[in-house]
Amino acid sequence: MGILSGVETANGYEPSWLYQILKPKKSGNVINGLGEAEKRAPTPIYHRYDHWHPWILYGATFMIRKIFTPQHRKYFKRMIEMDKQGFCDIATEQINAKPEEWAKKVKEKALSLPGCDVVGIAEVDPIWIFDKDTDTHKWVIVIGLSMDYEVLKNNLDRKTLEAEITVFETYLDSQKSAFELADWIREQGYDAKGVGGPKGSELNTIPAAIAAGIGQLGKHDSLMNEQLGPCFRMSYVLTDLPLAADKPVEIGVDQFCGTCDLCTKFCPPDISGKAIGTRRNEMVRRFRQMHPFFQ
């Protein structure tokens, strides 16, 4: 065990000395609402630094380490520059069309952008908005961008830096497309904002993506898309442009995950092994679902 780096052991994984010290007493499962029978909005944890929560020092240490890694610096710079740039002004004259027509145009525009491989639309459910945030946009457009699988699989050989870089690149390319799509909507005379990148946001993206037909939740607690599998990153656009919603899809993820144990086999900390099988479809804020095992 090192000061900053953990080690694999015969029993799984031992976190670094610093992370063991910073680990809060309040379990992430408790914050996430495991076992709660009442419906409520989720509470933000990772990558949120605008309010205090038990995991803020843990998450901040992770981000600081990444910022001071030379290979990561340019990606943080790019993220900051995009956020500073903001969005164009909303056109004073609105272009009118039927919701179904707008939905078709939005998808065509999104898929024409280099940072979008899949796109779906859902009406915003207020329960997706984190409890520290407020947002009144009616619609969310979720876009997904595939990651470079050949690079990402280096993570299985513990070549983590290469994998981290492709994750950052994909997040930011997806964010760029979300910003461009938001600007296009604003040019039509409607409010819109793009959100993305490796940081926290006001919307819980996964339930929105499920409602938008992007994919289904796998037992590894991440989204599975029919074309991209789990190997993609998402960003989204919140807007008041009148749209038509997509529907959730059934692509057989539950059946597939019932026979595949790869995420268990290749998880060094054995977190998936602790979660899968024993923690499927438990009550989380009144909803019965799969969930992360978050000690």
Give a label for each model feature:
Residues E100, K107, S112, D117-Q295:
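Catalytic cores of enzyme domains
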Residues M1-E123, D135-T136:
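Iron-sulfur (Fe-S) cluster-binding modules
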